[in-house]
Amino acid sequence: MAEEACQVRRMKLGSQGLEVSAQGLGCMGLSDFYGAPTPETNAVALLRHAINAGVTFLDTSDIYGPETNELLLGKALKDGLRDKVELATKFGITASEDGKFGFRGDPEYVRIACEASLKRLGVTCIDLYYQHRIDTTLPIEITIGELKKLVEEGKIKYIGLSEASASTIRRAHAVHPITAVQIEWSLWSRDVEEDIIPTCRELGIGIVAYSPLGRGFLGLPRFQQENLENNKILYEKVQAMATKKSCTPAQLALAWVHHQGDDVCPIPGTSKIQNLNQNIGALSVKLTPEEMVELEAIAQPDFVKGERYDNNMVTYKDSETPPLSSWKAR
């Protein structure tokens, strides 16, 4: 099995000057969505272990918890650690008491959300601020216009989008350069390769791959009985190839993402230091062009059965916004 010993290299994310660790850490699971929250002492220890190991690109959101994940990072980054990390958080998803999600990108909300995140994180500036999901009730230009003001005011350094369509990315980028687009990309989720990845590369936008270990493969619709048997075959083939490579299936899947290009930064999440070390070990797994072809033949985009999410969460396929002309006409 590949070990942690390899050094975590640095990479340029996007074209605006942001430099991050080549592998980031998705922090959501420490507070939300995957069972009970990790005890604070353990979570802080994991975050600090990651930073000391060279994984300095930390990803959170105001909806994780909600809010408690940002508070956790704020505690972990005390004692001078803030300057050692690249801190990314997100806004734009709201949650009602009955668990239904809403989406807001109006200027007033953008500003309020940013100020609240700054306070919870205990920082004066957010390195990378994403719109977590697109508000389709108003033109994307309106949201990005307010984010641009926050950049000019020094409250955020760089702007990102999450789960945005190619056309939405283009429209946003025309208002202010987008540094990164966060999207689910893994052996189990490859639909973004058709349109979104080429668009990002054309515009010089960095790609942040969330759930690079196939979160959606092991849960939600893809784990339902009607899809399970088909998807199990895929996993077994990956497992067999991992055995040949003397690594774990997770390391092989993560290595595949790392081999997609120098503009791609995966952000796997974990609550255990042992798993974090194994994820770092994926950086030392080298795949030949022939092995990449073999892996991609195993994981054809149309082979995985089931949607990534249930009907309570939207993706880039639901992110088209009204034209700016319609907003001006109001």
Swiss-Prot record:
GO cellular component terms given for this protein: nucleus
UniProt xrefs under CDD domains: AKR_AKR13D1
Chain coiled-coil ranges: none
Residues at the catalytic site: Y64
Amino-acid positions noted as binding NADP(+) in the UniProt annotation, renumbered to this chain: S211, P212, L213, G214, R215, G216, F217, L218, G219, L220, P221
Keywords of this entry: NADP, Oxidoreductase
Spans traversing the lipid bilayer: none
MF terms (GO), sorted A to Z: oxidoreductase activity
Record-listed substrate binding positions: H132
Taxonomic superkingdom: Eukaryota
Pfam families linked to this entry: Aldo_ket_red
EC number: 1.1.1.-
Similarity remark: Belongs to the aldo/keto reductase family.
Name this polypeptide is given: Probable aldo-keto reductase 6
Organism annotation: Arabidopsis thaliana
